Amino acid sequence: ILEREHRLSYSPRLMRDMDKAVARIQKALANDETIAVFGDYDVDGITSTVLLLDYLKNCGAKCLRYIPRRIEDGYGLSKDAIQGLRDKGATLMITVDCGITGNEEIDFAASIGMDVVVTDHHQPPETLPDCVVVNPHVGDYGFPDLCGAGVAFQLARALSDLNTALGHIDLAAIATVADIVPLTGENRAIVACGLKRLNLSPRPGVAALMRSAGMEGKPLFSETIAFQLGPRLNAGGRLADASLSFQLLTGSDDFELAAIADRLNTEN
């Protein structure tokens, strides 16, 4: 579906700095560096974090992750969080769904020996951060309306190939619907492919959430994500700790996943 129509077939390499991002990440993988993924507490940020960590861990990378807490930390990068990641050995930080306005924090990261690759979909400021920036609004990319997980999906695609990246298309689809970006062009294709995967073989955490919400065995549509799954995945980040949704999307123990799903269902 992604390649069926010309208007849906933008190469990830058309995004400004994508080649630089790929080169820096490949260098980190080759040198066994510790890579930190810095996300956000909403569905887009959480799924973007899971997507990129899944890909990097499948490549054998040593990874850290940081998802801010809405109340305690607020949105975006913070020097304290960056310092904490550096103290744990990270020499490369990749942001997902955030970072495009974090000029000061990115300068701080450079000052303590950490390279930064920003992947974000929000409107860029007049002065871009002094680092590698992958954003569909910057440069000549043909479709500016990707969500954060859509950008992360394109990064995974650039690092490998389309077939490998399609293993994470379910996450990009959930984020695309939940983040309320236009369901046209590439987004339409991402959601179509992602729904097919979700209906055929949902992640254990998604299946647990569907059971908890009384939707087991029912087909998933974009409306299901928008009004059922999305709000439940957002509940942790809105009220307490987005790591609950992260654990749900990355876990495999059915008993633990059921408990997390029930908690998110209750909080929603």
Q: What are the roles of these predicted feature ranges?
A:
Residues 1-92, 112-113, 160-268:
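Hydrophobic helix-and-loop "lid/oligomerization" segment in the mid-to-C-terminal part
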Residues 85-88, 93-95, 100-181, 187-190:
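Conserved phosphate-handling catalytic cores of large alpha/beta enzymes
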